[in-house]
Swiss-Prot record:
Source organism (scientific name): Sphingobium chlorophenolicum
Protein name: Pentachlorophenol 4-monooxygenase
Subunit field text: Homodimer.
InterPro entries for the chain: FAD-bd, FAD/NAD-bd_sf, RIFMO-like
Recorded family membership: Belongs to the PheA/TfdB FAD monooxygenase family.
Gene3D superfamilies for the chain: 3.30.70.2450, 3.40.30.120, FAD/NAD(P)-binding domain
Length: 538
């Protein structure tokens, strides 16, 4: 995996980028900047990192991101693998599943991993690779920007004040974002007034539903969520309608036991490790960018926890933004590229809010009866649509990149997720695009088109040497010893990318999306797409 040299300590006072917030969104942003040689500094007002967390699901699209970064195996080795969700409605056999085995790729499941542990893995990777650490107990007091740049006033852990002038700021500081407040950006939406969620990590004896699925137990006026966590504990969440609103842990355990027993009269809760409660919001920032300051994660959007997508979408915000800031900062990409962060990610957040609200109404539509909620889970197409949305695999940027798509081609379009394909033993497409820079994938359909494919590859390599070329010859071709030439040995590239009679090429982004795709006879479309993104070689 190619990386740039690091020219400055990650947390130097004169770092190019200030990241406010030390959670998963901020940590992914730091990774994307540092691996491209852009210095950054991360601050968080908390005195230490979180030791507990509410989020515990890493979905398929995020696992592909973790693979791209190089740390997916750590989550697989120590996480709990869940097949998906069960919806168990009270007093009926009309139950439903969201079975994640239908998903494409290497991660057709949910990885259960506490957010605080997810953060720990990311922090350790940043420290080991870049000697980078968040600055805990450091608070953003004020943030201003004008024609002279950005001014950020900080209070350090020892109480002293410091003023810095980063060129960029990423606000990943949660639902009560100080960055968003300083920018004067509205956070519009509503609260789910009827829903206070209460959560507990606790051992369970004789839990009959099993550990291979995440379980929703749904009654007309209540619900219980249960999933196995790494180690011996389970995560249990209930809707709080007053009965579980207790002040001490033992009373809380008794209330949880009562809720769980109404669905499973054999399961018994042990002494809880910890418990918490929170109110559910549905809100979204009216803008993700103001000048050189950006919002990401919960600072930009929050929603019902139904489906467990929140942490995942926040990390994907950072994965979309980090490489763009880095390439603009380095003079490799045009500044207009940064406008695409808002235009690409706000529709995703809107879909997220709508999708989580729909699932929220099934799980926590208290007082609305079960019949309509059950019918929603039986509707044609509901299973696959919900599974792809919750996993993050359905989100795309087709509308934003439609002008860079050749609609004659079968298979994925510009704006879609990059489909993986095994090209040869121990060589997968994902291995070839694990770069800090864009990749040009050129795929002639026949040996007769190889010369034309090489001509397009060489043209783009000459004008944009930053782009990594990968040429994949059709199945049956002789193996090549060239480093950037491969063979579709098993025909998987053809199956995953469409059975096209003519060859094609695609510009693949560092965040695992297709930026442009066109037939070999439309090389001008590829040139136009690259020219819109990158600075030409002088």
């Amino acid at each position: 995996m190619s990386t740039y040299p690091i020219n400055a300590p990650g947390q130097s006072a004169d770092a190019a980028v200030l990241i406010v917030g030390g959670g998963p969104t901020g940590l992914i942003a730091a990774n994307e900047l540092l691996r491209r040689g852009v210095s950054c500094r991360m601050i968080d007002r908390l005195p230490v990192a979180h030791q507990t967390s509410k989020s515990c699901t890493i979905h398929a699209r995020s696992m592909e991101m973790m693979e791209h970064i190089g740390i997916a195996a750590r989550y697989i080795e120590t996480g709990v693998r869940s097949n998906g969700f069960t919806f168990n409605f009270e007093n009926t056999d009309a139950n439903a599943l969201l079975d994640f085995s239908v998903l494409p790729g290497r991660y057709p499941f949910i990885t259960i991993y506490n957010q605080n542990e997810t953060e720990r893995v990311l922090r350790h990777d940043l420290e080991a690779t870049y000697s980078f650490q968040p600055e805990w107990g450091t608070q953003l007091l004020a943030l201003n920007q004008d024609e002279n740049g950005i001014r950020a006033d900080l209070r350090l852990k020892d109480g002293t004040k410091q003023t810095i002038s980063p060129r960029w700021v990423i606000g990943a500081d949660g639902v009560r974002s100080r960055v968003r407040e300083c920018l004067g950006i509205a956070y519009e939406g509503e609260d789910y007034e009827e829903n206070v969620l209460q959560m507990m990590d606790v051992g369970i004896q004789d839990f009959e539903a099993g550990d291979d699925w995440i379980h929703y137990f749904i009654g007309q006026d209540k619900f219980v969520f249960v999933t196995k966590l790494p180690g011996s504990n389970y995560r249990v969440i209930i809707s709080d309608l007053g009965g579980a609103n207790k002040s001490n842990l033992e009373e809380t355990r008794e209330a949880f036991q009562g809720y769980l027993s109404s669905f499973d009269d054999h399961a018994t809760l042990d002494e809880p490790r910890w418990a918490t409660k929170w109110r559910v919001w549905k809100r979204m920032a009216t803008a993700y960018r103001k000048g050189n300051v950006f919002l990401a994660g919960d600072a930009a959007h929050c929603h019902s926890p139904s489906g467990g997508s929140g942490m995942n979408v926040g990390m994907q915000d950072a994965f979309n933004l980090g490489w763009k800031i880095a390439m603009v900062e380095r003079g490799e990409a045009k500044p207009d590229l940064l406008d695409t962060y808002h235009t690409e990610r706000t529709p995703v957040a809107q879909q997220l809010l709508e999708g989580t609200h729909a699932m929220h109404e099934i799980i926590m539509g208290h007082g609305k009866g079960l019949t309509d909620r059950i019918e929603l889970t039986q509707a044609p197409g509901w299973h696959d649509a919900a599974t792809y949305r919750v996993s993050g695999m359905s989100y795309n940027y087709r509308d934003q990149l439609v002008s860079f798509n050749d609609d004659r081609l079968a298979g994925p379009s510009a704006g879609d997720r990059i489909p993986d394909a095994e090209l040869a033993p121990r060589i997968r497409l994902f291995d070839l695009v694990r770069n800090t820079r864009p990749t040009l994938l050129v795929a002639p359909a026949t040996e007769a088109e190889v010369a034309e494919a090489e001509k397009l590859r060489d043209l783009i390599r000459e004008q944009w040497p930053l782009v990594k070329p990968v040429l994949v010859r059709p199945q049956g071709s002789e193996e090549s010893i060239e480093g950037d030439v491969h063979v579709d040995s098993y025909g998987q590239l053809k199956r995953e990318w469409g059975d096209n009679a003519k060859g094609w090429a695609a510009l693949l982004r560092p965040d695992n999306y297709i930026h442009a795709r066109a037939g070999l006879d439309r090389g001008d479309l590829l040139v136009q797409a690259i020219d819109a993104m990158l600075v030409r070689c002088a």
